[in-house]
Amino acid sequence: MLIDTHCHLDAAEFDVDRDHIALMAKQQGIDRIVIPSVERANFDTVIALCNRHQNCAYALGIHPMYVDAAVSQDIETLQNYIENFNPIAIGEIGLDYFLRTPKLNPEHIEKQVMFFTEQLKIAAHYDLPVLLHVRQAVDDVLKYLRRHPVRGGIAHAFNGSLQQAEKFIALGFKLGFGGAMTYSRALKIRDLAVKLPLDAIVLETDAPDMAPAWIGPGVRNSPLELLKIAQVLADLRQLNVTQVHAVTGCNALHALPKLA
């Protein structure tokens, strides 16, 4: 089973061919596509999209890069949506310390942390896994996961150290690998993709972002690229790609049981 565990198919970049892409993905052997929300404003959008396409499944959450526009009422709204719409996970949630601008000040970080921890509490209450955004914030994400334990999930677009990866695995998480792994210069990620146990890895595209090497930066990524991404992982690990499909698919179902 081949599963794209992280794809923003609702993004504006897909307005011209969204439904066609979802259909083509199914026809090309991509069994499931996980579509996380990023803010309250697109909860309904991802739900409607996944209702149109049975191979798509949605997660609901508030992304750390969208907390500036978020209000505390959004947390209550998220709870109401969980009770009424049964998402497969809470996500995309987490912390993002990448923005080296005045915006990344203590008050902004505090708001990120507040939304992250409140959503972890919701995930624990409803026994849902989480889809984590951890950009340049791996240690802090781990810290709050220890304070607010959840049933696991996926650390999306993982780019930490082997030791940090092992800490996520110990907490019940799988690690997402996608387009970044396809670049020959991405030595750390490629090394991780080989050294980690295969049963800790899931595949993703993060489309329309994180375009693989054969597309190049700045060009729209697509869930249709998952087949080649899987082949890259197979080549790095010197495995048959069929085995990569089977094991990473099983890993995704373990991390996100409602996908089954």
What are the residue ranges of the model-derived segments?
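Mid-domain alpha/beta scaffold segments of enzyme catalytic cores
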Residues: 1-260
